[in-house]
Amino acid sequence: MALNLQDKQAIVAEVNEAAKGALSAVIADSRGVTVDKMTELRKAAREAGVSMRVVRNTLLRRAVEGTAFECLTDTFVGPTLIAFSNEHPGAAARLFKDFAKANDKFEIKGAAFEGKIQNVEFLATLPTYEEAIARLMGTMKEAAAGKLARTLAAYRDKLQEAA
């Protein structure tokens, strides 16, 4: 279906707004994936805080101009499905990676984070906010326990020297 100029401008503006508010983006080719599977992917994306859209490459190039995702323009070849992670930088990458495992025809073309093209594996393995806090707390707890042990050992050594 042909789009008139207003529709094209609306799509570019909508995608541009999504890109400006996103933490990361992932590009994929969904040729050969059934409608049912794509519906499942879209549902999972909504639940994960990921906005997904199939956009014409020329419109997508214009939409990402001046954003952190301009580096992805070389991947805009063939049918392009773009997903923006709004809450966590690794959400879209994790979603697409899991979906690609279950669907052979789904191909991830590229990903961007902080204005640079990134490996999808890197983005998918980024810890969530809760996981990062838990790791930090674990590190702090280990450091505190280690410091306590060293302090007690030093005190013991001091007492032995005095005796």
UniProtKB/Swiss-Prot annotation:
Q: Gene3D superfamilies, alphabetically?
A: 3.30.70.1730, 6.10.250.2350
UniProtKB keywords: Ribonucleoprotein, Ribosomal protein, RNA-binding, rRNA-binding
CDD domains, per database record: Ribosomal_L10 (cd05797)
Q: Fetch the InterPro entries from UniProt.
A: Ribosomal_uL10 (IPR001790), Ribosomal_uL10-like_sf (IPR043141), Ribosomal_uL10_bac (IPR022973), Ribosomal_uL10_bac_type (IPR047865), Ribosomal_uL10_CS_bac (IPR002363)
Give the Gene Ontology MF terms in alphabetical order.
Answer: large ribosomal subunit rRNA binding; structural constituent of ribosome
What are its GO biological-process terms? Answer: translation
Q: Which GO terms describe its cellular component?
A: large ribosomal subunit
The record's HAMAP family line, in alphabetical order, gives:
Ribosomal_uL10
Q: What does this protein do?
A: Forms part of the ribosomal stalk, playing a central role in the interaction of the ribosome with GTP-bound translation factors.
How does it associate, per the subunit comment? Part of the ribosomal stalk of the 50S ribosomal subunit. The N-terminus interacts with L11 and the large rRNA to form the base of the stalk. The C-terminus forms an elongated spine to which L12 dimers bind in a sequential fashion forming a multimeric L10(L12)X complex.
Family from the record: Belongs to the universal ribosomal protein uL10 family.
- Tell me which PANTHER family the record gives: 39S RIBOSOMAL PROTEIN L10, MITOCHONDRIAL
Write down what this protein is called.
Answer: Large ribosomal subunit protein uL10
Q: What is the lineage of its organism?
A: Bacteria, Pseudomonadati, Pseudomonadota, Gammaproteobacteria, Pasteurellales
